[in-house]
Amino acid sequence: MGPDFEIERELGGLVAGVDEVGRGPWAGPVTACAVVLDPMQVPDGLNDSKKLSEARRDALAMQILRVADVSLGWASVEEIDALNIRQATFLAMRRAMDGLTTPPTHALIDGNAIPPGLSCPATCVVKGDGRSVSIAAASIVAKVRRDALMKELAVMHPGYGWETNMGYGTAKHAAGLHHLGVTQYHRRSFAPIAKILCG
């Protein structure tokens, strides 16, 4: 069984699903997305973005952007290094929520922690992208948009494999760091990068 609209229906009102992508990579921002779906226009096939092919994610993201209230929030590498990844993720989620056209009455947050300072009540939903279509939609748009950014950065900084690893720690990424060094898009607070900088 995939995600459904049950949690949203029980809560009533305007419910935003919120998810993030990019907590673990060595490079690039963390990206959050908030989505308020129209219950009459829920795209078919919504699921955890990790369970979908890239082509399917891209197609669904286009549909979601057409029929839903969607807002993205980003926290930069500098903010990640200054705040830590947990707090930077919360910041990105708040930015995503604040960017919605109509303020929601409730937020469903994927995971087990609610960002402080949200503009409405919120509920954590563990593995929410597999349970709530709103969170699934947010996970899809967040991943598609962050992946697109990492592919753009890969053109500017070839040799790290960002076009395929999206900034995560892979053998190619490690080899790129060894041969080419650290870029402005690397998270200096993350151990593999800090170790190189300490030399």
From Swiss-Prot:
Enzyme Commission identifier(s): 3.1.26.4
Catalyzed reactions per annotation: Endonucleolytic cleavage to 5'-phosphomonoester
Note accompanying the cofactor annotation: Manganese or magnesium. Binds 1 divalent metal ion per monomer in the absence of substrate. May bind a second metal ion after substrate binding.
Superkingdom of origin organism: Bacteria
RNase H type-2 domain: residues covered: 13-199
Disulfides per UniProt: none
GO BP annotations listed: DNA replication, removal of RNA primer; mismatch repair
InterPro entries in alphabetical order: RNase_HII, RNase_HII/HIII, RNase_HII/HIII_dom, RNaseH-like_sf, RNaseH_sf
GO CC, one annotated term: cytoplasm
Reported function: Endonuclease that specifically degrades the RNA of RNA-DNA hybrids.
Protein name (database record): Ribonuclease HII
Naturally occurring in which organism (per UniProt): Jannaschia sp. (strain CCS1)
Lineage per the UniProt record: Bacteria, Pseudomonadati, Pseudomonadota, Alphaproteobacteria, Rhodobacterales
